[in-house]
């Protein structure tokens, strides 16, 4: 099996070869089911019998109608039925190597054929091929987890092993399909079951470099310090591959950093011999250890505080308060020629302190956008606006501009309330299940509905994903009606806080405009300095600037914020009118646009039901293709792209392009949740949930009726469009504002 071959890291050049290291890597499964690279069974690409026959196969060709193996491979149920009716073969027929028709149907993802053979009496535990493997093992090596589930339902033993001692859990781990692993782990297979060399599933996942599988095993209770026959622990195997996420995750779960193999090799020595020292050192640093693996000792006993996530969250939140004050004070009290470079040095120095603290703190704070720092930037701006207004602007303008002051106080208060509510409120986390039995029941239900895929199940939260939900990597939770994760509030925006977030943006927009008006009147009413001296500006502008430079610079700063606030407000209002979230706006709706009659015909032939969705089959009659749910590799882009996302520019221009797009309206992807602008706006703004207070988790208005997005798994019938709406598949894209 190609996916089980040792990775290139084991054949390192020079002295770092596996032979020089003395390691004994897990050998790859072999046999008939591993004779060719894995292929997804489609109309024109399936595992051919001829490609997997041994050289001893007879040269004489067999007519298709009489070749039971070929019939099983291509899924011709009617032809197979005819062979059985004519008594030419039985369901338990096997060739000289013990391979049965069920093996070929399983490896080619022929669900209907597998079901027919099982109903006809086929042995689900029959072993065959050079690897002496069962049909479930063959299917597992191609990640056909619907086939595996079918076989398990009919008595397939998940603890059976092939000739090399691999059971189905090991084979599934080698291919790295998390959904198949979730299915198998819920079959009560011991998570640390070993192969003939003592390798656990966690060791295989670490060796192959599959972070998602490593995380799944560890969350399931796998032992991070288990050792194989050679004394190698999962940490050693992760360093053989050199996967940083795998090493980090294993260290996070308490792996022994000094564990030695039977020949005395520590993880550090393995990293040195496998040329993965850079991975080892970086992992140690991010986990708070020095290069020798010892816990870093910080001066003045700061270690416990710096490593405390709650304390560091507060530090990053309040640090921008100081940064803003220092910069504004320098720029307002020094000569411009000195002020600009000194302010730049101050910013660099304060940022260096923050980054230094981040490098010693929790690993999730390594990137500044993943800390509450940006939320602190806004909160700091809000704080200094309040201080300046109370101490200087209000005393000078309350008698001359009473209504303007009243308006500002109202909108400042509303902005503050809605901001902190959006930041601290539960955005709509989908409740997790209470036990593994509940998880098993949900998985079984999804298999019955042909919906066990990433659109409908989250392998991180182990829950069924409601429509419009998305798993947020930052929050590590699925959020109902997920809009986006906003770093400016350090929280997700979802069904529970979306309305408050929109109100926060709108009140902020009005508040900024009122404050700019007030401060202009305030500065204009101040007496001019007796001898204004400026190096660049003319006397008139210089006189105005020097009246209260600090307040004027604060005005410039918040006026800059007005740009992205305006764009974000426009985008949110447009999306409200469409009943659309930011994520849906950026990624689009997943619509099945296949012709209904064609799909019904194909489904009826292969699965006995006219609903292709109910059968979960492709147009060729094959089982669901797990590869179709896998997202491709994503490039995060450079600094400009990241800041464009943070400031909302990409969302604004995407919305503008969508609004100005040429062509008929019908050509656009249809949103089955939209009921027209008036109804959409009424649902959003007239929702009976309180504006000032918590709503019932997950509840919202849809078409004038109360719905709960925590439990919405089917689109309401009145919202049905020409295509079947599906929940937007989650991918780990950059944060969208």
UniProtKB/Swiss-Prot annotation:
Q: Which residues cross the membrane?
A: 315-335, 336-356, 373-393, 403-423, 501-521, 550-570
Ranges of Low complexity composition bias in the record: 7-38
- Bilayer disposition of the protein: Multi-pass membrane protein
Which organism is this protein's natural source?
Emericella nidulans (strain FGSC A4 / ATCC 38163 / CBS 112.46 / NRRL 194 / M139) (Aspergillus nidulans)
- Could you list which ranges are Lumenal topological domains? 394-402, 522-549
Q: What is its EC number?
A: 2.3.1.225
Alphabetically ordered keywords of this record: Acyltransferase, ANK repeat, Endosome, Golgi apparatus, Lipoprotein, Membrane, Palmitate, Repeat, Transferase, Transmembrane, Transmembrane helix
List, from the UniProt record, the residues annotated as the active site of this protein: 486
Q: Where in the cell is it found?
A: Early endosome membrane; Golgi apparatus membrane
Q: Which Pfam families match?
A: Ank_2, DHHC
Ranges facing Cytoplasmic side:
1-314, 357-372, 424-500, 571-737
The coding gene here is akr1
Sorted alphabetically, which InterPro entries does this protein's record hold? Answer: Ankyrin_rpt, Ankyrin_rpt-contain_sf, Palmitoyltrfase_DHHC
Name under which the protein is recorded: Palmitoyltransferase akr1
Give the domain note: The DHHC domain is required for palmitoyltransferase activity.
Q: Which GO terms describe its molecular function?
A: protein-cysteine S-palmitoyltransferase activity
Q: Where is this region: Disordered?
A: 1-60
Entry's SMART domains? ANK
Where is the major localization of this protein?
Answer: membrane
Which chemical reaction does it catalyze?
Answer: L-cysteinyl-[protein] + hexadecanoyl-CoA = S-hexadecanoyl-L-cysteinyl-[protein] + CoA
| Family indicated by similarity | Belongs to the DHHC palmitoyltransferase family. AKR/ZDHHC17 subfamily.
Ranges occupied by ANK repeats: 97-126, 131-160, 164-193, 197-226, 230-259
- Does Cell inner membrane appear among the keywords? no
